[in-house]
Amino acid sequence: STGKPLAYLGLDLASTDDMTALAICTGDAENGWGIRMHYFLPEMAIKRRLAKDESSIYSDLKDLKNVTVTPGNVTDYNTIRRLISGHYVVDGKVEYDKDNLSEKYRIKGVAYDRWNSLNLIRDLEGDGVTCDPYGQGFASMSFPSKEYAKAIWTNKLHHGGDPVLRWMMGNVVLRTDPSGNIKPDKGKSGDKIDGVV
């Protein structure tokens, strides 16, 4: 319905055994952006990370409301679908959960990286969610990266103090091409930046 706030979603799907980030963006450039994040990762990813570094932010993830930890070694993409569209599969049967983003927002679209997303995106589109592929090269990432930085500098980006997003922002290293275009560099960044991407 039109009474729902408009939202833009961004989905950075990790490899199945790592952190996936879903950004829920509301607002506009003039008045400011509200960003709510939701993260998904498998339980074994947390255990592996804590085995290397007990003091890492991973020690607090299970206690955060905006983190879904799925059992086992791989992220269950069914949980991502359930949060976005409400649809999910149990024992081969599609179920519906009313507590989902499509019920709360008019979702303009889900921008996603084409890598490793085919089945989930096909399912979301089948659920009636518009999904738009989004490249992670300089041509696609430079303008939004500059706008993101501008929103931060002008205090028009509000994330409610999300500790995971704050940590990821601190990890970002930008790469610049000869034309002055910029983009986050996952390879050179100190740690996870999925929520920023």
What are these regions (language model features)?
Residues 1-136, 142, 146, 159-197:
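RNase H-like, metal-dependent nuclease domains and their acidic two-metal-ion catalytic environment used
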